[in-house]
Every structure is written in C-alpha cells, then in structure tokens.
C-alpha cells in the first residue's frame, strides 16, 4: 500500500507524511469522536495542567464501541496495521489509539526510550503550521549514530549551563485534517504553540516472536505503559482499555491476529 519511496523516507529520516490518508469525512468523524470522549471523560476540552503532568494535556485510551473509527483504526484497517509492518519491515503489535488534548508545549523528546523501536501514526485534528503547534522533528535522529552526536551537542549547548538554549536545526511538518504523520519512536520531536491541540495517535511495536523472553517482556511492558495513564482521572469502566476492542474481534481476521499476539505477550488475558 505504501510506496517504496515512503518506506525508505521513513527508515532513513525517521518520519514520512501521508497526505490525505483519511478522507475529509473520516477526519471529521475522528475529530468528533476524540472531542466527545475527551469532554465526557474530563468535563471539558483541555483541563488545566497539573504539577506532574509531563507534556501537559489530557490523554484518553480510545477503544470503545462509541468511537467506531478509532476502534477500527487499531488493527482492522490496512492503512495503519499493515502500513506499520511495511514501514518497520516486520510484523507488528498495536497499542490502543489515544485521544489527546495538548495544553502546553513539549521540549525535544522521543516517544520511546528502550531499544525496541516502532512507529507512531499521528493525526492532528485541526490544521497545523509552525505558529500553531505543528510537529517539529530532527530528521535522522532515530539512528543510533546520530543520536550519540545529539547527546554530545546537548551536553555542551548553553542551556546546559543555565544560559539561553541553541535552536536545534529541525523540520516543521505542516498538516491539515486527514493527513497522518508516521514517526519512528526514537525520532526527536517537539511541538510549540497552538494550544489547545486535539490529536489522535497510535503506536505499533515490532512483534518480538516467542524465542526471546526478555524482548517479549520489554514489548509487553511498553504496550501496558502506553495505555496506563495513572495520573489521569477518568472512569476506567467507561473507558476500559482493551476490553471492548478485544471482545469485538470475532470475524475480523487482522484484529483476531493482533489479539492473539497481545495474549501471547501477556498484555491481554
């Protein structure tokens, strides 16, 4: 489904933009699902940031029957589940989709620390430019050799000694609703401005197989961490994580396969 060029851009630079991957109708439907569920979970869109919120915002695992598009994008849709395998060059295992209303900026960071890797599909639900919170990335920063150089760069920049920081060379990714950005989980990224910002994201990790128990455990822990927002105060029965998605897998071959992999890993009972 993806072109050779798109796959190679992702592997070389750590990201690729997929313009119009969602139709206008799908983009509108996804925004409506995200806005409705966040408002129901937290009372408003964009609660005030707390003292220990990290990248401030409201985060909600979104895999309920009330949000059918978000539910189907996890593993029913080849544009996400199959595309993740094409980008990574191996079978994958999904996390849950996450509805987010960002209420602050983020500094340079990666989405994952451990040496597992993976891909995130990021959908901003309003138009985003440099001045309104578009994703900023450092191309190639997912590669271990470049990452080591960036750590050296960061260690000697003025901010490390309490002075004004350097502006790191980067690319701003302008998007409109319907566009999806595929991001390697080790790519350095940040966002600035445009708050509150509505988005929907999902991560896919490489399927580790069953021979390496340590790697299986690492993937399991990452998947569980991705959906356990312990700092968030919402009704876990109304937004139960995996339950409704897994219960509806019968007859959907790709979802059944994803459920089987998650059970082998110990993510699902």
Kindly label every feature range from the protein language model.
Residues 102, 138-145, 204-209:
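Short edge-strand/loop segments of extracellular domains
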Residues 130-190:
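Double-stranded beta-helix
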Residues 33, 46, 187-269:
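Non-heme Fe(II)/2-oxoglutarate
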Residues 98, 110-112, 123-127, 137-139:
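Short, structured patches in soluble enzyme cores that scaffold and shape functional sites
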Residues 107-118, 168-169, 175, 193-196:
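A short beta-loop-beta micro-motif enriched in histidine and acidic residues
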Residues 114-130, 174-175, 182, 203-207:
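Short, conserved beta-strand element in jelly-roll/cupin
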Residues 109-110, 155-166, 214-222:
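Short, surface-exposed loop/helix-turn segments at secondary-structure junctions
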Residues 1-12, 19-115:
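Non-heme Fe(II)-dependent double-stranded beta-helix
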